[in-house]
Amino acid sequence: TKITAKAGDQVTVENNKDFFNYQAGLTFKPVENGSIYISYATSANPVGVDGGDGSEGITAAIQNLKPEEVKTYELGTKWDVLNDKLNLTAAIFRTEKTNTRATAEDGTTQNIGETRVDGIELGVNGNITEKWAVSAGYTYLDSELVDGGYTNVGSTAVPVYQANPSNGNQVQNVAKNSATLWTTYQVLPELTLGAGAVAMDKVYGNATNTKWVPGYVRYDAMARYNVNKNVDLQLNVNNLSDKRYFTKAYSSHYATEAEGRSAVLSVNFKY
């Protein structure tokens, strides 16, 4: 990452960090149509990567810090049922982020923060009958700010740093519950209709959990008509009810607003 101060300051700050990420997993198949797996993966978040959307300030004070490190542990299972037409999945996982940038006891910014997310994922995908297909999923995320560093409870002139009172709060922009449902049905050989919904819990925009955007449910629909074996027409309508909702909150005064009702008509060619 790189920042350049305002005109006249003539200050350029650069950060060049190398990091190595990897993943490993093991799968066991007790029967032909089922499997159980365990996996471990790492990733990294360089300094300043989130600065473009305003969720992270890009300042000279943080440019020499290490990348944030993420570790994910997962245990899950996958099963094919109904003659392999329908796939069922379930997983539990933990994601730990360390080296998070936070204020230290001396008032400087250091890699001392930590967050943790424990989650459950359930999924269904495939065909219930030859004409009826379904895709559904549910996710539960128990997120926590484990260590938010220190906060100044004194003044600028006489700072007094104490452990962050937001420790234990829900992590910003991590919904506790979310679910999706999409289903299609072949009404006629040439005509397929589909409908679905997306549900999301409220999310907080700050560590103190005092600013948030409410949860929402969005409904979508689709119609596809096969003109012949090579051409089909498809109409997708998103946010059928034209609901106003927000997908992300920030610690400042603004949030990310989602699109209103929209429609897309497409022509698909297959050869």
For every predicted segment, state its role.
Residues 1, 36, 86-90, 134-136, ...:
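Transmembrane beta-strands of outer-membrane beta-barrel proteins
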Residues 1-10, 48-57, 61, 100-108, ...:
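Outer-membrane beta-barrel translocator domains and adjoining extracellular loop/strand segments
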Residues 1-31:
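Signature of Gram-negative outer-membrane beta-barrel scaffolds
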Residues 18-20, 69-73, 116-120, 175-179, ...:
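Residues that define the transmembrane beta-barrel architecture of outer-membrane proteins
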Residues 24-28, 75-79, 122-126, 136, ...:
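Residues on the lipid-exposed face of transmembrane beta-strands in outer-membrane beta-barrel proteins
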Residues 29, 35-37, 41, 64-149, ...:
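Membrane-embedded beta-barrel scaffold of Gram-negative outer-membrane proteins
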Residues 91-96, 111-207, 241, 270:
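Gram-negative outer-membrane beta-barrel transporters
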Residues 198-206, 224-271:
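C-terminal beta-signal and adjacent terminal beta-strands/loops
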